[in-house]
């Protein structure tokens, strides 16, 4: 069975379990156990840590994936890996020193709205360092095509850690201060796990020396770092701008809608863990026919699986919001239902273009990545300003959808022009028809007046309808092969 199918299937399961646990943490455990004030503190500090983390890693985890397969000798490969460990220290050490020397000033600045934040800002630097090195060691695993354990640590472990700490807090075994201490400890324990695992797969010779292509590696890292900034703007700018333009509760409704649609990305996140290094290796070997094959397969399989998830979500959206109302007793969340539809369309557009981002970022045209990223960030900001004013907070979702579809089309066109390859086949039309027809059939179908029963039964019917058509029309040869092998094993 294909290595991609094996690991992608395992990674999808991990991400789905992680998403379920994350949903419980976000919608129920956090608010009811730790309270909204402390919950807000954790969210703010972890968000700030996530902003700093890319500065610390400086895109070197992506450089490992791009350049590791481009060199033949173990000596040169080892130089790249050691560089990825040492280089972040030139950023981490001075920033950490500045942070410590100006601790009170930074604390006062960050705690203007909530004075309690000042007491816990050590979380920002501590977790940023841990996460930066986790990503670097995880990239070591990816280039060896071993992604499942790292994906488990990245997606499921941290959510499980939060759940355990919340219950320790609930049973009064720890207070909030020790909650933060154990949170940091848990992140560093995760780093130790991935470090030992990556070294068990591939152990470099720990001798400090400079790779032959040092300039190219650092230049690539810089460009990826800049593009990461643009990507983070697209992710966070909606909520940030809405916070200035609409009421706080509207922002909360918007964030929950975004959270619901996040699961549509799970197949992409799972697939690209293993696909990125394979695309890099294929490009380094100049194997364009294989690259086109990866391109087409990633497009059709991602569209098929992401389409299935989007049909489940969009067809059951009323029941999903009924569940949210039961947990929170706030019916206002329903006004964000259109956000779910717009963001779902944008995510399906990203699934449709498959591994186009991997192709561009791992090719000699990687210098265009910051252009696409920063241009899309600027465009979404201007569209937000215009559309939020015209149609309210829904305008933020519309602008996101427009920008993602537009720039996916531009990237698709760029790859077609430069590589003479495209990701579509006749199966693409069949899959799109399958997604649209299933949505039309099940969206207005009500089987029971009890929303939980209705939700479960519709999910079952959608699963059997969608999977049966997929199997008998052979829309995914990889998925059919996987099912046949599993059937034979039984």
Where in this protein do the model-derived segments appear?
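Membrane-proximal transmembrane or re-entrant/amphipathic helices at the cytosolic face
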Residues: 443-490
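Transmembrane helical elements of multi-pass membrane transporters/channels
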Residues: 7-23, 182-198, 211-281, 301-302, ...
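Hydrophobic alpha-helical transmembrane segments
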Residues: 153-167, 172-200, 220, 374-379, ...
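Membrane-interface junctions at transmembrane-helix termini in multi-pass inner-membrane proteins
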Residues: 5, 130-156, 341-375, 415-417
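Helix-loop junctions and terminal segments of transmembrane helices
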Residues: 56-72, 143, 257, 261-299, ...
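Signature of the first transmembrane helix
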Residues: 3-62, 91-100, 127, 219-249
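Interhelical loop/hinge segments that connect adjacent transmembrane helices in multipass membrane
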Residues: 1-4, 116, 176-182, 192-235, ...
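Interfacial segments at transmembrane-helix termini and the short loops linking adjacent helices
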Residues: 103-124, 314-347, 394
